[in-house]
């Protein structure tokens, strides 16, 4: 998408693309994982608020908030400290800062964007909606969800990463067909 905004490509294909800032899916992934462990909703919400605050502070170059005075269980406080250590790495600090949305109006080439409805790594609704709202409206744009597939476009039951290795399908045939058809229609 960034190259498309710089007018360096004839078309762009986004597969399970993250359009919103990296912080948003990380908070959501944590929310899902913690909820799945059976933690109380209040604890999950408190942890996710703290995590979002830390990501915002990192993006703004401010000190990271501490979990010491929170009511979080000790295991979550340790987990939070591990995440704070990772935030010191160039990759993660850049990942949470990247937000493609401001570039979308500059993209004039055709865009095909596909996201799976069972993708728990990149929320399809949030990211496809950001594309719909931000792109300049090229008539060749196709922005759609693919029903029943995970982040790597396999038909799945839950979308959990642990499920990937159990699925024989490499990539959904409908996804490959959609890509081929879309490119063929660009002529």
Listing of model-derived features with the role each one plays in the protein:
Residues 117-120, 147-150:
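Acidic beta-to-alpha connecting loop that harbors the catalytic carboxylate
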